[in-house]
Amino acid sequence: MEITIIYGTETGNSESLAQDARAKLTKLGHQAKVVDMEGITVEQLKNAGTLLVITSTWGDGEPPTNAEALHQELKDSSEDLSEVSYAVFALGDEFYENFCQAGKDFDSFLERLKAQRLLPVVLSNGDHDDTFPKWVDAIAGKLSCCFFQISVILSSKER
């Protein structure tokens, strides 16, 4: 099962975290790829299988520049993403009124399009040295559990 990790960033933090997630998940035996949000469409997300969204919030609650087009496309979309499971890690600063708004938006859009949430959205206030590894571990646990359940079902059908 391939994992698609998309990131929205202005300063490179989300991209760095996306690469860290890919490295950890690959080490655990998962296939994972990292994609800049600027290079992906909602149509492509339909085939993502498992989608991890890592994004910061910029300005007054806006998505980063490289995430603007996908943000708008998801907002306007009526695609059925029910075959996609996802999790969102949002970076922000609690000092701002619209703390982690871009991440909250992506979570809301994906839920509205019937994507299956793996974990509640994580809102990180600059403390991602602690929260991010736990988030990746939780995702790995969910994916391993799902893979095990699929394997058991397939094995029992072979009998």
Task: Describe the role of every protein-language-model region.
Residues G39:
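Glycosyltransferase specificity loop/lid
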Residues E2-T4, G12-S16, K24-V34, V42, ...:
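FMN-binding flavodoxin-like domain, especially the glycine-rich phosphate-binding loop
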